[in-house]
Amino acid sequence: MSIKRFVSALLTGALCLGVLTACGSTQKPASSGVSADAQRYSTIFYDAFDTVTQVIAYCDSEEEFTRQMDALHADLLEYHRFYDIYNDYDGVVNVKTINDNAGVAPVQVDDKILGMLELARQMYNTTNGKLNIAMGSVLRIWHDYREAAEANTNEADNKLPEQEALDAAARHCDISNLVIDENAKTVYLSDPDMSLDVGSVGKGYAVEMVAQAAEARGLKSALISVGGNLRAIGTKPDGSQWSGGVENPWNASDVYTASSSYVSGVNMSDMALVTSGNYQRYYVVDGVRYHHLIDPDTLWPARYFDSVSVLSPDSGAADCLTTGLFCMSLEDGQKLIESLDGVEALWCTPDGEVIQSSGWADHEKK
């Protein structure tokens, strides 16, 4: 993530968790179980998943909040290390380890990796291949060109990948070559030129697991934002719901400000809100923006939408779905969402239209 987008993520999270939570729903769902005397606390972390994490929670004391946040932070950093595809860590077997051993040997991994990979494989089928973590060879090419563009001082020097190189890399994206042995707890890439890229699932899955662990430790009322991926735990002490917002993709800037706007605000209790957009990670060639959401069919940035948001009880599934939906037609996406219980979506099209799934309005702030 560039410095500009890092600042954007920080301010986006602050606005999502500050402005929107200040005016939560006055509905009275089932009691959150948190004490009516609980106080509101907040904290920010900067060292997980290359983005900004902000948490707001209601706790009975600052000591309780600190205990909860220390544990949540430690959990998040553990997932960060497990899902890293670029770096090694002492004593840690992670996704990079799996990639390094492609075609060599199965790698025994932690359950936190197995669970994430199983979800990704399931969502590959759900999205008819539009969510494919086996596309690492193709995504690495785009990543390298984007990184080179960020290093350029002259935009005119930015370049695009050659189609021939993309086609060659695409021959090593068959997810059937991802071999998972649940009994032995091993993962093996049978194609030596294949690599995993879990950017479309890792953060969302981690947020879900971290939230569930926090709940198991007794946290009853919180809103977690990791780079804008929102996950609500329970309700506020007064019974009102948390709130989240979908950023206006046409008003998004490198530095997010109070003048930026939302196309929708939703009420959230034990729900996740995740957005994927073409304004988040990109570079420009000849005046055209080339973002990071690559269509598996074309091997180029998907052009169906400017952003897609998913509201779901599960943050991991929501993360996968935003990527999958971004890379498929509106008609196919609507059919998919209507087939999933408790899941809603919002699409922002290149011509400025905002389209909601049939149940989105039930969650929308009035």
Regions found by a protein language model. Name each.
Residues S2-K366:
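Mature catalytic core of soluble alpha/beta enzymes
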